[in-house]
Amino acid sequence: MGTGLAHAPVRDACKNTVPGPGAKGIGTGFIRNYQKWQELCVNMDTICENVPVDTSYNFFGKQVALPVFAAPVGAMQLHYGDKYDDLTYNDILVTACADAGIAAFTGDGTNPAVIQAAAEALKKNHGCGVPTIKPWNIDLVREKAELVGAADPIAVAMDIDAAGLPFLKNLTPPAGSKTVDELKEIVKLMNGKPFSLKGIMTVNGAKKAL
């Protein structure tokens, strides 16, 4: 992870100092999310057949061993240090997830090489993964959708919560938040592939996404 992160048993010392994991603003978003996760527990039900538990799940037509997926990460050297570039990281991640019977979501960034590396890794692993496109302007979304579509992924995602990132909002034309009509247009660009919106923050947002 490089030297940019402070050492702490619970990773809460780097808020607003590191792109991505450090969060933005007052830097409490990830901390509050982690605290909320501590309230969730798995309850065991022993009144059932005494057979091995089946954890498999049908994910958009792809049978996976467990409904747990690797999160999309892009621009590795910008965020996490210089040990892995995007090509190496995606090759390791997508391959390892496919070998484990699950799937990886892959990241995106302002550098075209980020999603190109993701597409190459997905193609190498027979499309076993979900490329995640940031909420760029429609022309760039179209370009990236065509690129990842050639890898025949399970689905395509968009991390719409990235709409507040300054490097997106300051582009010309600007990227960022999307209207319902804009999302409908984006869905059409997926050529029938399932489309997932990551980072919907409210119930009202979820209703509009439907």
Can you describe what each PLM-predicted range is?
Residues T95, K124, W136-L210:
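Alpha/beta enzyme core
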Residues A113-D139:
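Long, hydrophobic, well-ordered secondary-structure blocks that form the structural core
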Residues G22, D82, T106-G109, I133-K134, ...:
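Glycine- and other small-residue-rich loops at beta-strand/loop junctions that grip anionic moieties
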Residues F59-T110:
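Active-site cofactor/substrate anionic-group-binding motifs, chiefly glycine-
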Residues V51-G61, N90-L93, G107-E120, K144-E146:
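Short, charged beta->alpha transition segments
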Residues M76, D108-A113, D161, V203:
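Short glycine-enriched loops at secondary-structure junctions
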Residues V68-A71, I102-T106, G127-I133, V156, ...:
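Hydrophobic faces of well-ordered beta-strands that scaffold small-molecule active sites
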Residues M1-V64:
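An N-cap/entry alpha-helix motif that binds or orients negatively charged groups
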